[in-house]
Swiss-Prot record:
PANTHER family: CDK5 REGULATORY SUBUNIT-ASSOCIATED PROTEIN 1, MITOCHONDRIAL TRNA METHYLTHIOTRANSFERASE CDK5RAP1
PROSITE patterns in the cross-refs: MTTASE_N (PS51449), MTTASE_RADICAL (PS01278), RADICAL_SAM (PS51918), TRAM (PS50926)
Keyword Metal-binding on entry: yes
Protein name as it appears in the record: tRNA-2-methylthio-N(6)-dimethylallyladenosine synthase
Protein's organism: Flavobacterium psychrophilum (strain ATCC 49511 / DSM 21280 / CIP 103535 / JIP02/86)
Gene behind this protein: miaB
Length: 481
């Protein structure tokens, strides 16, 4: 599984509209990837129906929940510091309960509850519907835990509230879990095996968002392009499905087509893709429909075949390059972004140079780059020595970052003189006189407000750029308005 960590969103307290009949207060923070933020919306919806309104004031909360990430050691250390803060407040307000959700819950359940005694409940990603029962256990003075992984839970029957929402963009989860056993990743062990959500429940959720005025959705999954609905159950069991189930199964390109046709004025994104599942049929659907954004996040992790094999990635360097060529041929204006790990165990300078040369070949629009962080419970953590020094990791990572910066500038400059369609999402951070949004390629665009408003689709002529931002002037509304 690939996880995009948006640093600007980490740790925000999440708020939804209060119900007057609710008397208890929930403080919930989320860390990690978009799936964690989507899960927090599900949790808030469940607890809203069980007497809880949300608050962004920690000290007044009856219940504090933190949705956790285990992808890197830095993320876990951040969450541990937050737990220390919660417990400091709890010493002043002993009635306050503290719970851990998400990926750290399964991995560190015993440590949190029994050894360190810093939380009252621990709830895994597939057990959120059990929260009301677990809270009853806590109220009766018992620690509560449920980290059982499910074969079929997709939360398709839960209508998520939209936390920290701008009312314009929303996440729609379509798969859960992961069947790819990448040696560096904890996700298959913390989120379970892959299963997909029923298509009609997805369409119903998008319909609800459309009626509420949302303009853009992101179809979300650990491996979104391997979506496969055949009546329920794990994807790995599809081979045992009946002939009728196989004949009526819906895969990702079919779902993408359904959404694009069903909501022609809704902008559609998806994340995250795995190279081995990004089939030509998906690319043709993307090219066919103008409301499907022309951006593909396509993690590669390394440009070295030897390291890819050590990582148990299900593609080679050559297969990845062929896929890049297909994307360029079928969707010439597509942007492509990457995940890259520097300093994986046994990585040599030659392996690193293979990564550099792959980046030179693709010239990504942007990327998410990290030095290797050994994660307990992964195959790499158990079987491989973390033998690349921190100094070498840092140097290689910086070389990757510097090259990506160069390519991002080059790609951004290509937009100068073009007119691009932008969905206005918010006021610019740098100037209250400017709006900020993204174009189809997921590049941030900033332009003067004039008479436009948040939620408008605006055509913007690009005048200048930085490596990560396009700057221009509005020339009118787009056809999507």
């Amino acid at each position: 599984m690939e996880k995009i960590i948006e640093e600007s969103k980490q740790g925000g307290s999440l708020i939804l509209e209060n119900k007057p009949e609710n008397t208890k207060k929930l403080f919930i923070e989320s860390y990690g990837c978009a799936m964690n933020f989507s899960d927090s919306e599900i949790v808030a919806s469940i607890l809203s129906g069980n007497g809880y309104n949300t608050t962004n004031v920690l000290e007044e909360a009856d219940l504090v929940l933190v949705n956790t990430c285990s992808i890197r050691d830095k993320a876990e250390q951040t969450i541990r510091k937050r737990l220390e803060k919660y417990n400091a407040v709890k010493r002043i307000n002993p009635k306050m309960k503290v719970g851990v959700l998400g990926c750290m819950a399964e991995r560190l359940k015993d440590k949190f509850l029994e050894e360190e005694k810093i939380v009252d409940l621990v709830v895994g990603p597939d057990a959120y519907k059990d929260l009301p029962n677990l809270l009853n256990e806590v109220e009766e003075g018992r620690d509560a835990i449920n980290v059982i992984l499910s074969k079929d839970e997709t939360y398709g029957d839960i209508s998520p509230v939209r936390l920290m929402s701008n009312g314009i963009t929303a996440l729609v989860a379509i798969t859960r879990g992961c069947d790819n056993m990448c040696t560096f990743c904890v996700v298959p062990f913390t989120r379970g095996r892959e299963r997909s959500r029923e298509p009609q429940s997805i369409m119903a959720e998008i319909q609800d968002l459309w009626h509420k005025g949302f303009k853009e959705i992101t179809l979300l999954g650990q491996n979104v392009d391997s979506y496969l609905w055949y009546g329920g159950g794990l994807k790995k069991d599809f081979t045992n499905a009946s002939e009728i189930q196989k004949a009526t199964a819906v895969d990702f390109d079919q779902l993408l087509e359904m959404v694009a046709v069903g909501f022609p004025k809704m902008r559609i994104r998806f994340s995250t893709s795995n190279p081995q599942d990004m089939h030509e049929s998906i690319l043709h659907v993307m090219a066919k429909h103008s409301n499907i954004c022309k951006h593909i996040h396509l993690p590669v992790q390394s440009g070295s075949n030897r390291i890819l094999k050590e990582m148990n990635r299900l593609h080679t360097r050559e297969e990845y390059m062929i896929l890049i060529d297909k994307i360029r041929a079928i969707i010439p204006n597509a942007s492509i972004s990457q995940d890259m790990i520097a300093g994986f165990p046994t990585e040599t300078e030659e392996d690193h140079q293979d990564t550099i040369s792959l980046m030179q070949y693709v010239k990504y629009n942007f990327g998410y780059m990290y030095s290797y962080s050994e994660r307990p419970g992964t195959l790499a953590g158990r079987k491989m020595k973390d033998d690349v020094s921190d100094e070498i990791k840092a140097r290689r990572l910086q070389e990757i970052v510097d090259l990506q910066q160069k390519h991002a500038w080059w790609r951004s400059e290509d937009f100068i003189g073009q007119t691009v369609e932008v969905l206005v999402e918010k006021v610019s951070k740098k100037s209250t006189e400017e709006f900020s949004g993204r174009n189809s390629q997921s590049i941030t665009v900033v332009f003067p407000k004039e008479h436009y408003k948040i939620g408008d689709f605006v055509n913007v002529k690009i005048k200048s750029c930085t490596s990560g931002t396009l700057k221009g002037e509005a020339v009118g509304y787009s056809e999507m308005n």
